[in-house]
């Protein structure tokens, strides 16, 4: 039973260390990108899903929000 425990601990710590390393590399990359953009004087790129065009530009806003709801099919 103890051997199984040791094997599981080793596998889990290996997975955690790989995941932590990936997160660390990702953070370093974002920081270096931000520094490069700041040095160039460009605008900051934001990594947010909310910045995507939530309402397609070809739809009028009033028509989009004031449209009638679809009827339910039972």
Swiss-Prot record:
Chief location of this protein within or outside the cell: secreted
PROSITE patterns in alphabetical order: CECROPIN (PS00268)
An annotated GO BP: antimicrobial peptide secretion
Subcellular location: Secreted
Keyword flag Secreted: yes
Residue spans crossing the bilayer: none
Name this protein carries in UniProt: Cecropin-P3
Source organism of the structure: Ascaris suum
Gene giving rise to this polypeptide: ASCEC-3
């Amino acid at each position: 039973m103890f051997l199984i425990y040791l094997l599981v601990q080793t596998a889990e710590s290996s997975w955690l260390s790989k995941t932590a390393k990936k997160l660390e590399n990702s953070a370093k990359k974002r920081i270096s990108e931000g520094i490069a953009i700041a040095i160039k004087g460009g605008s900051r790129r934001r990594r947010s899903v909310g910045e995507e065009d939530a309402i397609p530009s070809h739809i009028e806003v009033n028509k989009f929000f004031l449209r009638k709801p679809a009827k339910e099919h039972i």
